[in-house]
Every structure is written in C-alpha cells, then in structure tokens.
Amino acid sequence: MGKKPVVIGIAGGSGSGKTSVTRSIYEQFKGHSILMLEQDLYYKDQSHLPFEERLNTNYDHPLAFDNDYLIEHLNELLAYRPIKKPIYDYKLHTRSEEVVHVDPKDVIILEGILVLEDERLRDLMDIKLYVDTDADLRIIRRMLRDIKERGRSIDSVIEQYISVVRPMHNQFVEPTKRYADIIIPEGGQNRVAIDLMVTKIQTILEQNAIL
C-alpha cells in the first residue's frame, strides 16, 4: 500500500472541548508529521457584502462554511501538495486577505462544529470523532472565548447563544453524532478515550506505510 495521510475528523458543539482533544492528539504525535486544519477558517468570504449585513451572519449554520474550498484543500494535502490556508477575520466578519502556507503532513486533524455534516468531508476521513459535552459547560466556554478572542460583549454572546447557537446545535450539530466512529464524553478530560484514539491512529499509520 502506498503512503497516504491519515485524516481525523473531530466534531462537536461550540465549546465542547474539540480543540482540547485536538491538541491532546497533536501533542502525542508532535515528533511526527502532523497538522491541524480548523473548519472555522473556511467560513465563506463576505467581502462583497456591506458590513451591517455581515453582522447578521449565522456562523452555526452549514451554509456559512465554504466546504468546497475546504475539500479542495484537503484533497491537495492528501496528494502531499502544500496549500495556502485562509484566515478569517471575526471583527470584519469576512475572510482576511492574508493566508498561511501549510505543508502536507502524514496526519491531518480536521476540527470544527460541522465537519461531520457534509458527506463529502466524511468520505475523506479515516476516523470520525464527536466530542460530547453538557450544554452548560459549552456556553461558559463559548462566552469566555468570544469575549477574549473575538471582542464580544457578554450580552451579545448570551443573546446569540439563545437565538442562534442552541437551535443550530440541536438542528445541525447534535444529529451528526450518529456519523461518529467514536463519541468522546468530557472532551479533553477523557484521557482514556484520547489514549485509545492515539493507538488507533498509530495502527492506521502503520497500515499506510508511514510509521
């Protein structure tokens, strides 16, 4: 069998601990060839829209993502070709003109709330994970992130959670759990599940003639 990268999809609600799980797996393979690809960098470019209209963007809906662009980049990485990863500007609510050069690696971790929603993405994955965390923990984590990293107010985060995030989670994110090979409760705190994942990834790497 020829050399082929391993693609791991990590999904779950906003604030579920996906990033913690991703980093835990990444740390286990730090000495190897591994990269992280975040779905939320692939929100659609909205530079053609007035700023006031961009403010109404529903970032928790599947249509907010440019999955065609993400799939194009994944296929490039799977062919061991480099990509120019986009950067999303949450203050301007559109894609930045800047990009990041990313070289291909043997392990690709694709992380995002809806990475399991699109069948085309699922078909590119070797392992599909869903991080399952209680709603109260998810809202607290989302509040802290949006206030610290995205310049949001507490009131705006709470209002958005009630009117958008929660209904979108119930309608689109939670149902993707059924596509997961493994469901990880307690996010990054679940060391047993993460250790099992690391072992499984090592097995696939060996089968793909990488390790």
From Swiss-Prot:
Chief localisation class: cytoplasm
Pathway: Pyrimidine metabolism; CTP biosynthesis via salvage pathway; CTP from cytidine: step 1/3; Pyrimidine metabolism; UMP biosynthesis via salvage pathway; UMP from uridine: step 1/1
One GO term (biological process): CTP salvage
Top EC class, one word: transferase
CDD domains: UMPK
Residues binding ATP: 12-19
GO molecular function, one term: ATP binding
Alphabetized InterPro entries for the sequence: P-loop_NTPase, PRK/URK, Uridine_kinase, Uridine_kinase-like
Gene3D superfamilies per the UniProt record, alphabetical: P-loop containing nucleotide triphosphate hydrolases (3.40.50.300)
Keywords, ordered alphabetically: ATP-binding, Cytoplasm, Kinase, Nucleotide-binding, Transferase
Taxonomy, superkingdom: Bacteria
Subcellular location: Cytoplasm
Reactions accelerated catalytically: uridine + ATP = UMP + ADP + H(+); cytidine + ATP = CMP + ADP + H(+)
SUPFAM superfamilies linked to this entry: P-loop containing nucleoside triphosphate hydrolases (SSF52540)
GO cellular component: cytoplasm
EC numbers, comma separated: 2.7.1.48
Similarity comment: Belongs to the uridine kinase family.
The protein's name in its UniProt record: Uridine kinase
Organism, scientific name: Bacillus licheniformis (strain ATCC 14580 / DSM 13 / JCM 2505 / CCUG 7422 / NBRC 12200 / NCIMB 9375 / NCTC 10341 / NRRL NRS-1264 / Gibson 46)
Gene (UniProt): udk
